[in-house]
A protein has these predicted regions:
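Eukaryote-biased activation of long, low-complexity terminal tails and linkers
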Residues: 1-407
Length: 407
């Protein structure tokens, strides 16, 4: 936290900070012209230290009008922060494991954030113990009713959607404001049997344009309420081939895609991957998570934009792909291999490392895994590589079995 007064600082980002209420008091004391604050908190303790107003200017002189809070796990800490910032007009908050309903939100907003106009939030929590589908739905309806009051619907026109499912004997829910405002798509992992409801009219389709990261699964969009969604700004995507017919209605364009991780369980779907590559002109990184071993990736795919390859995938037996000398040569001669600047790969022999370095002319960073790189070896692999490679290459052992080589 700052120890000197700053009269010029207007925008501040604090990431992964384990903080308490008193820290915030000192922060705002030292930054009287702060307008926007982004805080990502690591704290999950019930910090309930009293807020001392003498550390602060008068409330009406506080300049912060926009606040973004991510990974919040302490209700007292969040409430203390709201008390310090009564001039907030725009609030975005992501909360985990805190049970908050619409009535509690209303009380905090009325008491501490009277000027709030734009409110975006997402809460993931275990609502109660799961009993059966009918009882679970009743519990969700009771919870959602707190967001259907005149304060939410008429006065502010703030609407929410809720997903719920059973997980480890608990009724797990995710509730968020509409339009959706966060980077990750708001569904639980492997949650094939989720249900969803909203406080807005069923014929209103709100935007999910903020979503940048998606692990695509067809079951995610089986509910009618989500089947009309379009995710037009995806930057990081993972999926398994073959993709279904619904994929391109959900993700109609891939112009913004930068990173793709793909699983290919059979060889019959290679053309489908090439079709995806053809639609992604800005794709920088391609990773193979799982694929058949009759031919090692990246096969014969082409893409003029890919500069990073991650070939450390698995075969159907959950064994990591290991490239031999011949396969390394084929890789270096492939279209994507020729233009590759960053490569992650596992090799069978140290000679493969030299083969890659000398034959991939555009390569600048190599993350290489070699199972037999062990402390007990007679010859240290790093020293061997230093002997055979030009001095322009730096060699770092991240750990035994994983070496990073850069030029």
């Amino acid at each position: 936290m700052p120890t000197y007064l700053s009269i010029s600082l207007q925008y501040l980002t604090i990431r992964n900070y384990d903080c308490c209420s008193y820290d915030f008091s000192r922060l705002f004391e030292k930054t009287p012209r702060l307008r926007k604050c982004f805080i990502s908190s690591n704290s999950d303790e019930d910090d309930d230290l009293p807020i001392s107003r003498e550390f602060l200017p008068a409330p009406q002189s506080l300049s912060v009008t926009r606040l973004i809070l991510l990974s919040i796990r302490s209700l007292p800490l969040m409430t203390s922060l709201f008390k310090l910032l009564p001039s907030i007009t725009r609030l975005k908050v992501e909360i985990y494991s805190i049970t908050l309903d619409g009535h509690q939100w209303k009380e905090m907003i009325v008491n501490y954030l009277p000027q709030l106009k734009d409110f975006q939030f997402k809460i993931d929590l275990d609502l109660c113990r799961s009993i059966d589908d009918s009882t679970n739905e009743d519990k969700v309806d009771q919870y959602l009713s707190t967001y259907r009051t005149s304060f939410w619907i008429e006065h502010h026109q703030w609407f929410v959607r809720c997903h719920w499912s059973q997980w480890n004997e608990y009724l797990q829910i995710s509730v968020y404001s509409l339009p959706y405002a966060f980077v990750y798509f708001p569904l639980f992992d492997n949650d094939h049997n989720y249900h969803t409801k909203s406080t807005c009219s069923s014929d209103i389709h709100h935007s999910y344009d903020s979503v940048r990261i998606l692990g695509y699964e067809p079951w995610m969009f089986h509910d009618e309420a989500l089947s009309h969604i379009q995710l037009i700004n995806i930057e990081k995507l993972s999926l398994q081939l073959p993709i279904d017919q619904q994929f391109f209605s959900i993700i109609p364009k891939l112009e913004n895609l930068l990173s793709l991780t793909v699983a290919i369980p059979t060889e019959n779907h290679r053309l489908q991957l090439q079709a995806l590559l053809d639609r992604a002109p800005r794709l920088f990184s391609l990773a193979f998570k799982f694929c058949v071993t009759s031919a090692m990736p990246p096969y014969r795919y082409t893409s003029s934009s890919i500069c990073r390859l991650d070939l450390q995938g698995y075969d159907p037996s959950r064994r990591r792909h290991r490239y031999d000398i011949r396969q390394c040569m084929e890789l270096s001669r492939s279209s994507i291999g020729i233009q590759c600047r960053i490569l992650a790969i596992e090799v069978e022999k140290p000679k493969c490392i030299l083969q890659l370095i000398y034959s991939m002319l555009n390569l600048r960073t190599l993350h290489v895994s070699y199972e037999n790189d062990k402390r007990s070896n007679q010859y240290d692999l790093v020293k061997v590589l230093q002997h055979y490679l030009p001095s322009t290459w730096s060699i770092t052992r991240f750990c035994y079995g994983h070496i990073i080589i850069q030029s």
